[in-house]
Structures are given as C-alpha cells and as structure tokens.
C-alpha cells in the first residue's frame, strides 16, 4: 500500500575500537546477527558487496537484537549491526550504558547496492539521537512497508489508504520514526510489490499519483 519509515543498516562500534568504516571490521569481534534473521541476511549482502567473509573477523557472534547492547558494553564484541527504525531501544541502551558510536557505512559498494536494488535507499541517522554520536551518520537501508493481500476488497484498502494520507500529521505522531514521512515518497519509494488498486484510487484522488 505504501512505504513507511526507513530502516537503516546501522553499525555501532565501541569507542576507541579503531572502527570508522565498514572495512575496519576486519580483524574485529563483530556481531553478525542470528542465523535466519533479517539482520544476518542484510549483513551478508553488505559483506559480499565489500568482498568480505566471516573469516575476516577475529570473532563473528550471533547474538539476538535483545542481547547485543549487553554484549558490546561488557566488552565481548567490538561492533554490532542492526537494521532498524530509529530511535531504537537496543541502541539507546548501549549508548547510555557504555561508550559507543555510530559509524557511517558508505563507499562505492554501497552506491552500487542502492543503484541496483530499488528497495534500498540512502539513509541518514540524525546526529544527537544517541549519546556519543553528535554528527549525522550516513548509511543505506530498506523502507518498512505497509502491505495488504491482493484479495482484500478495493473499497476497504481505499478507505485505509485515504485515511492515512488525509491524516498524515496524526500518523506521524504515532512513532518517532514516522516524524519525517512524506506522502509523495510513501507512494513512490521503496515499494517491492505492486500498489493495490484500492490504494491507487485513493492516491489518484489526492493528487499523489497520475
């Protein structure tokens, strides 16, 4: 139906770890995400883009999202990755418990990923959102999407889609990650499936689509 907030691929490193780019993870202890998770899948995509393998890390751990903050603050890992909307509780926990910093993930490999895959986009995490990171962090990510089944009646989808777009200010207030949503982008960017006919009718009426 529409895309929502971006979920940036986020690299969090212990302060003083010597990690200032994705490639600096070589020789470090890195949480790569638990098997079968979206975190792990995205990490493997990025590793492949940079020509890296698990063996390039001094240690590759598989902690869940709920475990990562404790592990990095206990000194068991040097860095963790998390693809999530911001602000994120796990990153807040880490940044308020110990000295960590967000690291930008950029370069030609990322530019190519974004260019080759319509579901990826450049993403920015505002500076000051987390303790220890005062400047903006540039990375890439996916857009969370609001989906429905193709079998749902068009009139039902029409009502929902129109209500969201006509009340976008109220929708933005539902979660901090929604604060900067732009209806024009929501109906055009980061969509990996066709727009339902009911939603399309609503968007055309509202002038969001031709």
Per-region residue spans from a language model:
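Acidic, polar ligand-binding/catalytic clefts
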Residues: 1-5, 85-88
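Bilobed "Venus flytrap"/periplasmic-binding protein-like clamshell domains
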Residues: 3, 7-74, 169-172, 185, ...
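A broad, structure-centric signal for solvent-exposed, well-ordered loop/edge residues
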Residues: 8, 20, 32, 109-112, ...
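Short, low-complexity, polar/charged sequence segments that are solvent-exposed and flexible
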Residues: 18-19, 30-32, 49-52, 82, ...
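Ligand-binding clefts/hinges and TM-proximal coupling segments of bilobed small-molecule sensing domains
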Residues: 35-45, 120-188
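Pocket-lining segment of extracytoplasmic ligand-binding domains
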Residues: 54-152
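An extracytoplasmic/periplasmic, membrane-proximal ligand-sensing/linker region
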Residues: 67, 74, 84-102, 112-115, ...
